[in-house]
């Protein structure tokens, strides 16, 4: 390239010199300017000589005198001619200079283009060798005088934006992975290479800083999202269970995790606003009777049997209602503990109601937004289920098991949709199953009521055994343990789909637990009314005892009055603490029964089947007893009703929520271990939604039913006179009215009184019901419209598929017909060409010999003319278009039978 450029330069210089020597008018150098000046001097000297010759002629012919007018006129004319010649010479010189400059500029551009093309790869190789940043190389090139034009910058900017869009949309491209990686690397290299050229100086540095911070921010958000995913408790355990047991079993553990989070918030609310202020700022233990163990109970207050029944020191601790004092303010902060206790009790139900409804709403929105379709279910699972980013063998095994389980779920759904059944037999069996279950529910309710009534008689006796003290809790736990399997056995008669059967099973167990719980509450309320009647007597006895004590003691001004120890003061029964103790016992006994059932019914059963199967008479794994399946309905309903007891009992026992948090925490680890080690998947696995909206609906109903007894005790029953933060008041809600009157301005009290008017509350409730009805109708209409649109989309998809299939068949048919027609047309064209061209003498002789050969008939030797009418048909002279026979011809590459033969080489 350099030799060519040098040759072009030498040729250009030689041409310039030649033009200067020849005195051509197109020279463009200093020599040209000098030559033009020489020509101007010659031109100036030429008219002088002409003038001399003319003067000689004039003198010879009689020229005018020097001062004559004719002499003056000729002088003026000569002067004008000289000025015109000078102006023409200057104009010629300027035009020649412009032409020379233009030629020099075009020559420089022609010689600079190959130089620039050669310098670009040199510069890139140099930058690669030095391994310097791209921005420094661009800055050095800009400082060297090679700045980019505006058009080039615009082109670079456009290409950079295109590459960025390609990087952003790389995931959605239907390309192979190798092509994606190649294109991604090339796009990233291009962006890094040319992005810095869009700025200069400080602007360039600011742009680079912004890009760096943007990349850092994207990386931080990605890492933070990964961190949040890792912070989700028990997520990997639940995914492991889902991969082996299906989404139905995993839905229980998701629900258990959600319940743990709700109880953790409730525990923080109660512990931070009620228990901690009373312990830190309230009166210490032993200072007043309600915080002191009675003298008669001090001897056995620390025995294990007493503490196990939540008596002794536990009864007079901050875990229960009776420990809290009724002082309006406590401590140096003047903390209003009674008001805080009341508001926290109300807030527990308010927060639970809001969080349950919000969770149901979010799950509903997520389920409607998914838009799942039943088209090509198995194809989608087969070709799109695997995650290609898995790099761990254990994770790959879990994913494999999860895909297998999802196939089983889809197969069950397909079988159930295509199943035919005897409708009359099915109806009879379902009616029989419901009758048996109703009998079981009535029997369990009567049994609980009978046991509670008998426990009231045991409470009046002195020497009571451990079973008689805990008979109610034991009976309720046994009913909760044995009734769900009985219901499941009866439900086998109904032959429902597994998902529908689970809902019926949950509803029946829900009715069982609800009946047991409300039977227990009714019997407990009878006990509460008896204790309230006894409190009036104890209250009068206490007052008379203190009056006689102080009157019978002799004292004067010099002798102080003997103090009465808090342990010796007579006290009432404190029915709120008694109710809290009953709920505490129920919670602990239910937890123990659940753990014992898992150990005996699942773990020991699995060990027996596993190790005794080799030496037993029959196959223990396939027959009786076999491995246990995870009881979804029983565990879910047990969790829901345990939470209902927590909601009811937390008002009377603030420490109950903390015990429930520990119970849920241990249950998660214990049940996860038991499921993975002792249980097997269900024989008929089925798909369950991870949203758990059915569970949430049951939980919302239990929350509403748990609110009713607490609201009844707050609004109707008088509190105990000697224990709890509401002692000394007629009703518990009086603390709210007292706080408004003493701590708020008068007009706020009037506003609260107006808002509490039943004439305003009842219309507000009716308006809320109307709004709920309206929104429900709107949601139903929208769901129907959504279903119709989905059907329309499905129909359009089927029509489009049918059109595509028809079009594909047509194109396939055309593609099959096209080669035949093309070959046929080519043959016909060749025939036409041969007919139009006159054959040579040798060819005509050969044709005549073949036509006259033996064994050849006239029809066989006849050439078939093309069938298409648009092709030209040549006929020999003497044969018209209407003649009856064609000439006897045969092409040299066509056999007598009409089949094409291989053409001989020339």
Curated annotation (Swiss-Prot):
Keywords: Cell membrane, Ion channel, Ion transport, Membrane, Transmembrane, Transmembrane helix, Transport. Residues 69-79 have a biased composition (Basic residues). It is found in: Cell membrane. The keyword Cell inner membrane does not apply. Residues 80-127 have a biased composition (Basic and acidic residues). It holds the Pfam family TMC. Residues 135-147 have a biased composition (Low complexity). GO terms for biological process: detection of mechanical stimulus involved in sensory perception of sound; regulation of calcium ion transmembrane transport; vestibular reflex. The chain crosses the membrane at residues 264-284, 337-357, 432-452, 509-529, 694-714, 751-771. Residues 820-846, 854-866, 886-900 have a biased composition (Polar residues). Residues 1-150, 800-906 are annotated as: Disordered. It catalyses: Ca(2+)(in) = Ca(2+)(out). GO terms for molecular function: calcium channel activity; mechanosensitive monoatomic ion channel activity; voltage-gated calcium channel activity. Detected in fetal cochlea. InterPro entries: TMC, TMC_dom. It is a multi-pass membrane protein. Residues 1-263, 358-431, 530-693, 772-906 are cytoplasmic. Residues 285-336, 453-508, 715-750 are extracellular. GO terms for cellular component: cuticular plate; plasma membrane; stereocilium; stereocilium tip. Pore-forming subunit of the mechanotransducer (MET) non-selective cation channel complex located at the tips of stereocilia of cochlear hair cells and that mediates sensory transduction in the auditory system. The MET complex is composed of two dimeric pore-forming ion-conducting transmembrane TMC (TMC1 or TMC2) subunits, and aided by several auxiliary proteins including LHFPL5, TMIE, CIB2/3 and TOMT, and the tip-link PCDH15. Forms the MET channel composed of TMC dimer (TMC1 or TMC2), TMIE, TOMT, CIB (CIB2 or CIB3), LHFPL5 and PDH15. The interaction of TMC1 and TMC2 with TOMT is required for the transportation of TMC1/2 into the stereocilia of hair cells. Interacts (via N-terminus) with both isoforms CD1 and CD3 of PCDH15. Can form a heterodimer with TMC1, TMC5 or TMC7. Belongs to the TMC family. PANTHER family: TRANSMEMBRANE CHANNEL-LIKE PROTEIN 2 (PTHR23302:SF17), TRANSMEMBRANE CHANNEL-RELATED (PTHR23302). This is Transmembrane channel-like protein 2.
């Amino acid at each position: 390239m350099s030799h060519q450029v040098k040759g072009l330069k030498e040729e250009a210089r030689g041409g310039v010199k030649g033009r200067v020597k020849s005195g051509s008018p197109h020279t463009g150098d200093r020599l040209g300017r000098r030559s033009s000046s020489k020509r101007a001097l010659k031109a100036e000297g030429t008219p002088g000589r002409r003038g001399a010759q003319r003067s000689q002629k004039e003198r010879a012919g009689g020229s005018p005198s020097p001062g004559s007018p004719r002499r003056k006129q000729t002088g003026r004319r000569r002067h004008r001619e000289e000025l015109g010649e000078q102006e023409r010479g200057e104009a010629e010189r300027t035009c020649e200079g412009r032409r020379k400059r233009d030629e020099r500029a075009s020559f420089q551009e022609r010689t600079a283009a190959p130089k620039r093309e050669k310098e670009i790869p040199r510069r890139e190789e140099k930058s690669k060798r030095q391994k310097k940043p791209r921005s420094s190389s661009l800055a050095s090139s800009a400082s060297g005088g090679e700045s980019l034009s505006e058009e080039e910058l615009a082109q670079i900017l456009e290409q950079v934006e295109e590459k960025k869009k390609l990087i952003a949309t790389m995931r959605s491209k239907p390309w192979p992975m190798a092509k994606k990686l190649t294109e991604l690397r090339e796009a990233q290299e291009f962006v890094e290479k040319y992005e810095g050229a869009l700025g200069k100086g400080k602007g360039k540095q600011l742009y680079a800083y912004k890009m760096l911070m943007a990349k850092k921010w994207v990386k931080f958000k990605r890492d933070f999202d990964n961190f949040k995913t890792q912070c989700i408790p028990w997520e990997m355990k639940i995914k492991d269970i889902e991969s082996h047991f299906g989404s139905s079993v995993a839905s229980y553990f998701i629900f258990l995790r959600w319940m743990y989070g709700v109880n953790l918030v409730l525990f923080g609310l109660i512990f931070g606003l009620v228990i901690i202020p009373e312990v830190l700022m309230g009166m210490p233990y032993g200072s007043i009777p309600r915080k002191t163990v009675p003298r008669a109970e001090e001897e056995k207050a620390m025995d294990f049997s007493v503490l196990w029944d939540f008596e002794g020191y536990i009864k007079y601790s901050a875990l229960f209602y009776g420990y809290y004092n009724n002082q309006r303010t406590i401590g140096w902060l003047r903390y209003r503990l009674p008001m805080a206790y009341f508001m926290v009790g109300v807030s527990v139900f308010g927060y639970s109601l809001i969080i349950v409804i919000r969770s149901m709403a979010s799950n509903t929105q997520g389920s409607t937004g998914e838009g799942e379709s039943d088209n090509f279910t198995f194809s989608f699972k087969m070709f799109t289920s695997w995650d290609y980013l898995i790099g761990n063998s254990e994770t790959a095994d879990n994913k494999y098991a999860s895909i297998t389980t999802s196939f089983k779920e889809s197969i069950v759904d397909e079988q159930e949709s295509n199943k035919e059944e005897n409708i009359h037999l099915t109806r009879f069996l379902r009616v029989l199953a419901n009758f048996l279950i109703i009998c079981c529910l009535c029997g369990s309710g009567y049994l609980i009521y009978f046991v509670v009534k008998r426990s009231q008689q045991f409470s009046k006796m002195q020497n009571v055994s451990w079973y008689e003290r805990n008979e109610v809790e034991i009976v309720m736990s046994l009913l909760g343990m044995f009734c769900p399997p009985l219901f499941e056995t009866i439900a086998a008669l109904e032959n429902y789909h597994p998902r529908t059967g689970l809902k019926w099973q949950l509803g029946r167990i829900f009715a069982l637990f609800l009946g047991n719980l409300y039977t227990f509450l009714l019997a407990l309320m009878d006990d509460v009314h008896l204790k309230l009647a006894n409190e009036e007597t104890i209250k009068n006895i206490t007052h008379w005892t203190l009056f006689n004590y102080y009157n019978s003691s002799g004292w004067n001004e010099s002798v102080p009055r003997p103090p009465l120890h808090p342990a010796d003061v007579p006290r009432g029964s404190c029915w709120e603490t008694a109710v809290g103790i009953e709920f505490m016992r129920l919670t602990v006994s239910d937890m123990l029964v659940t753990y014992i059932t898992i150990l005996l019914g699942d773990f020991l059963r699995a060990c027996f089947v596993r190790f005794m199967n080799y030496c037993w008479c029959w196959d223990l794994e396939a027959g009786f007893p076999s491995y246990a399946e995870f009881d979804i309905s029983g565990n879910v309903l047990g969790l829901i009703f345990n939470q209902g007891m927590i909601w009811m009992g937390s008002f009377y026992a603030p420490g109950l929520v903390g015990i429930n948090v520990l119970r849920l925490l241990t249950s998660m680890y214990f049940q996860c271990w038991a499921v993975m080690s002792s249980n097997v998947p269900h024989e008929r696995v089925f798909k369950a939604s991870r949203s758990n909206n059915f569970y949430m609906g049951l939980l919302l109903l239990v929350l509403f039913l748990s609110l009713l007894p607490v609201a009844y005790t707050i609004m109707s029953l008088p509190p105990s006179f000697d224990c709890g933060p509401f002692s000394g008041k007629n009703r518990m809600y009086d603390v709210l009215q007292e706080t408004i009157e003493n701590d708020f301005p008068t007009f706020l009290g009037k506003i609260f009184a107006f808002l509490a008017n039943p004439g305003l509350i009842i219309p507000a409730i009716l308006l809320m019901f109307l709004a709920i009805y309206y929104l429900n109708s709107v949601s139903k209409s929208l769901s129907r419209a959504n279903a119709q649109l989905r059907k329309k989309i499905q129909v359009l998809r089927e029509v489009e598929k049918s059109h595509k299939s028809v079009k594909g068949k047509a194109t396939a048919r055309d593609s099959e017909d096209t080669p035949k027609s093309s070959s046929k047309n080519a043959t016909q064209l060749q025939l036409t060409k041969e007919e139009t061209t006159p054959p040579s003498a040798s060819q005509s002789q050969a044709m005549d010999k073949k036509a006259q050969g033996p064994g050849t008939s006239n029809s066989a030797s006849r050439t078939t003319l093309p069938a298409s009418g648009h092709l030209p048909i040549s006929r020999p002279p003497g044969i018209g278009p209407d003649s009856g026979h064609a000439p006897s011809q045969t092409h040299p590459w066509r056999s007598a039978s009409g089949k094409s033969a291989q053409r001989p080489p020339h």
